A protein has these predicted regions:
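Signature of N6-adenine DNA methyltransferases within the class I
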Residues: 22, 56-62, 79, 83, ...
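A short, conserved, highly charged catalytic patch centered on acidic carboxylates
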Residues: 1-105, 119-122, 147, 733
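Flexible phosphate/Mg2+-sensing switch loops adjacent to catalytic phosphate-binding sites
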Residues: 47-50, 204-207, 332-351, 373-407, ...
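C-terminal substrate/ligand-recognition segments
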Residues: 310-327, 355-356, 366, 741-753, ...
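Metal-dependent nuclease catalytic cores in nucleic-acid-processing enzymes
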Residues: 33-38, 89-106, 394-395, 425, ...
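Preference for the N-terminal adenyl/adenosyl cofactor-binding alpha/beta module
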Residues: 2-18, 129-372, 408, 412-421, ...
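Amphipathic alpha-helical
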Residues: 702-734
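Short, ligand-facing micro-motifs at secondary-structure edges
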Residues: 565, 752-768, 786, 795-808
Length: 813
């Protein structure tokens, strides 16, 4: 009877452990290969001959280490010998063999390494003994399976995500869109992974099904996939007795993944080839981070921007989950790993932890958290095994010992497709970890059919009661990366969603979209011992948002446990968008020791600083909240914004344009003024503007070149979507907002580098026009200048002002 692939893999794992230390060709090669045959159920010692006498190409006598006529030739060497020489030696034996005896596979081996050559194709693959279980399909003919053609497989990476994206685009262009398209892509993703990881048996069943059971022009691929999905959703005992045997070999998957009947997709030759091309990749090596990249590469750019999606590297995800729970769990394990009773209780604790991401996207945070929890569980099992009476046993059935499962993980995602990706991603990483355990303990196992499922809800997190997904009393940790959208970038629907959460909070109109998750998390965690941590744009700890958000967090009795101060957050997707972020961990409990992660370089690693308290500005200081103030606390001049052109560039000139205009129209020189935006002031560059405040309409019309520019301003303003700008097209010779003082003033750029010790300031006379990228202090004195350039004022500014990315944003409030 032919062994199934799971049994073969289990035997291969045990074989790898048994022969891990073998090295001597003379004494150990023969028992090594006899044991190797038993992996495939071959116990008859006479199928192959050891030390077969053969004549080499030059007529000299040689000895083939192992020969199975028509099937296999092996040249074996002691550990560490040159395999290239061994290959040449093995090929040299073939010249004088009868054609009927020529082997299908030639294998050279030194105990630690294998090199397998497929003689029909000439292709070769190398692997190490410890990875034999991954390559058993190459030896399928030994167990009665057809020869598995060797393919060079590239690891799945961002290119694979983009390849799936092209398939998505082709299907969409053919008219296959919406929900059906999204579900189809998720199913294909699962099938590609299952084909390379032992879920589908034999390996590459999915690829073979497409190649052998569908037409090359793709005309019946849609119906073929529909039939396959139906089989994957039907238990083996309930399948039709006359089912195609190639379909019947696919395992029942369950998990409701293949439950819904989809409309049939129409494929072309190119689309079928694209799917087969994807089959050629090594999906067993998929990184959990790929799912965010996959989603991002196939989403519409506009939709991605509107959702504020940021798909993140594992390094950045670990910045959040390590201080939230992982470091503490690892420390506890190190304390108790020598005590079996305590290990048992700790393992029980791991099984009971729950994780909730209320803005889970494609599930990156949940996937990495699950993987790390399973890695820790593996350490627990290894430590327990080493303390048990079974220490030294090569194969251990651990299937009943694995307790951590995907049903401990919960999420909310507003879009259907990423919600589906998140669920499948957790199943896939679960299978990856099961393979890790299989290698560790020498016995293959897989959790198929899918019994447990993650609790991912497709819903609007700002409108759903989170307790419907996971009751707060059952939640251990809340975590994630909610969308970052400043007030000016929020859609009307998003503003309404946020208003539903913050309607009773004074001043909430200034809040970033992400603040809705902070406030809902605080309400959710109130009165519990659970903890939360979110990645956020750094603006929530700067400027006018601070008093509003953190005042509410104080009212809800939240305490900050740890914080990463501003750093540059990058993602794994195309374009690698960089955002300046913070991470804030908080909860209802107030731990005695807290941690602040500081960054000398926002692109570099942090260093941890122990703190007694962490305030709203993420420093170890009293939690004083500075509210927005419109009226100064003492008698000082008002700080106002500079004048705003809203001209499309037509009223502004560089030096060459100024000279050309004066040459063409000398009378225009009277109306040209020096113009200072923030860039011109900071970098000492020259710019000019047409300042036609006192120029009559008649005089403007007498200057045709000036009139062309005025007309361009008019057209630009009329084309605007802003109603006030359209109205102001009627005064197109003027800046839209005129705030120029009639006296000298102190110019203050709104944005300047965080690397400066102080905000750059400068005195200007009233003839120099100040642009709206600056603020102005009219009638300023040296006293005002001294205060604003003082170390005290700039220290205050650095910790409390708003920022653009990491640059200082200086305002008049």
């Amino acid at each position: 009877m032919v062994l199934n692939w799971n049994e073969i893999k289990s035997r291969a794992l045990l074989f790898s452990k048994t022969w891990a230390d073998a090295s001597n060709e003379d004494s150990e090669a023969k028992p090594f290969w006899l044991d190797f045959f038993e992996i495939f159920g071959i116990t008859n010692k006479r199928v192959a001959t050891f030390e077969l006498h053969v004549k080499k190409l030059g007529g000299a006598q040689g000895f083939v280490d192992l020969f199975w006529p028509g099937v296999l030739l092996v040249e074996h060497k002691s550990r560490g010998k040159n395999l290239d020489d061994a290959v040449d030696q093995a090929i040299g034996y073939l010249h004088n063999l009868p054609e009927r005896d020529l082997p299908q596979l030639v294998v050279v081996c030194d105990f630690a390494r294998f090199r397998v050559r497929h003689m029909a194709t000439g292709e070769t693959v190398d692997f190490e003994l410890q990875h034999l279980h991954k390559y058993v399909k190459l030896f399928g003919l030994l167990a009665g399976y057809k020869v598995q053609e060797i393919q060079a497989e590239d690891p799945v990476n961002i290119k694979a995500a983009e390849r799936m994206g092209r398939l998505h685009d082709a299907l969409k262009a053919s008219g296959y869109t919406g929900h059906a398209l999204e579900v189809l892509l998720v199913r294909l993703l699962f099938c590609l992974f299952a084909d390379d990881t032992g879920i589908f048996q034999p390996s590459q069943s999915f690829r073979d099904f497409i190649e052998e059971r569908t037409a090359s022009d793709g005309s019946d691929l849609g119906s073929g996939l529909g039939r396959l999905f139906q089989v994957l959703n039907t238990h083996e005992s309930q399948r039709n007795k006359n089912i195609d045997e190639q379909l019947n070999q696919f395992a029942y998957i369950n998990g409701r993944l293949f439950e819904e009947t989809l409309p049939m997709a129409d494929f072309s030759t190119a689309m079928r080839e694209a799917l087969l091309d994807a089959c050629g990749l090594d999906w067993s090596a998929i990184s959990p981070a790929i799912f965010g990249s996959l989603f991002q590469s196939i989403m519409d750019d506009k939709a991605r921007r509107n959702l504020g999606a940021h798909y993140t590297s594992e390094t950045n995800i670990l910045k959040l989950i390590k201080p939230l729970f992982l470091d503490e769990l690892h420390a506890e394990f190190e304390r108790i790993k020598g005590n079996r009773n305590k290990l048992f209780e700790f393992h029980k604790k791991l099984r009971q932890l729950t994780f909730f991401d209320p803005a889970c996207g494609c599930g990156n945070f949940l996937v990495i958290s699950y993987r790390e929890l399973r890695e820790l569980e593996l350490k627990v099992l290894r430590a327990d095994h080493d303390l048990s009476a079974h220490k030294g046993q090569l194969a251990v059935d651990v299937q009943g010992l694995i307790g951590v499962n995907v049903d401990q993980f919960f999420g909310i995602e507003i879009e259907e497709f990423p919600a589906q990706i998140a669920q499948v991603a957790l199943w896939l990483v679960d299978h990856q970890m099961n393979l890790r355990v299989s290698v560790e303990f020498g016995m293959y196992f897989a959790r198929i059919p899918l019994i447990s499922a993650p609790g991912i809800r497709n819903a609007n997190a700002l409108r759903l009661d989170w307790n419907e997904v996971l009751p707060a009393e059952r939640c251990s940790y809340v975590l994630g990366n909610p969308p970052f959208l400043g007030k000016q970038y929020q859609t009307p629907a998003q503003k309404a969603d946020l208003a539903r959460v913050v309607h009773d909070i004074k001043g909430a109109g200034v809040l970033d979209f992400v603040c809705g998750w902070y406030i809902l998390a605080a309400r959710y965690l109130k009165g519990t011992s659970s903890r939360a941590a979110f990645v956020s744009t750094n603006s929530i700890t700067q400027g006018e948002q601070v008093a509003v958000l953190w005042g509410e967090m104080q009212r809800l009795h939240m305490h900050t446990h740890f914080a990463h101060r501003t750093f540059q957050w990058t993602n794994e997707a195309s374009g690698k968008a960089a955002v300046h972020c913070v991470i804030v961990g908080f909860g209802a409990e107030d731990p005695a020791v807290k941690t602040i992660y500081e960054y000398e370089d926002i692109k570099g690693p942090p260093h941890a600083v122990t703190a007694k308290r962490i305030n709203a500005y993420l420093v170890d200081a009293p939690n004083v909240l500075l509210k927005k103030r419109r009226i100064p606390i003492c008698a000082v001049p008002d700080v106002t914004y500079g004048s705003k052109p809203t001209d499309g560039g037509s009223l502004l000139l560089n030096s060459a344009e100024k000279d050309a205009l004066i040459k063409a129209e000398p009378q225009a020189e009277k109306w040209i003024r020096k113009f200072l935006g923030a860039d011109e002031f900071i970098n000492n560059t020259t710019r000019w503007c047409l300042w036609l405040v006192d120029c009559s309409p008649r005089d403007v019309r007498l200057m045709p070149e000036v009139m062309k520019r005025v007309q361009a301003v008019r057209e630009m303003r009329l084309a605007s979507t802003d109603k006030q700008t359209q109205i102001d097209a009627g005064k197109s010779s003027l800046f839209q907002k005129i705030r120029q003082p009639s006296t000298n003033y102190l110019l203050i750029p709104l944005h300047s580098s965080e690397n400066r010790q102080y905000v750059p300031l400068g005195f200007c006379n009233s003839e120099v026009i100040c642009g709206n990228a600056n603020s102005m202090l009219a009638d300023a004195t040296l006293f005002h200048f001294g205060i604003m350039t003082s170390a005290m004022h700039n220290a205050f500014m650095r910790f409390t002002c708003g920022r653009l990315e990491s640059r200082f944003r200086y305002s008049n409030t």
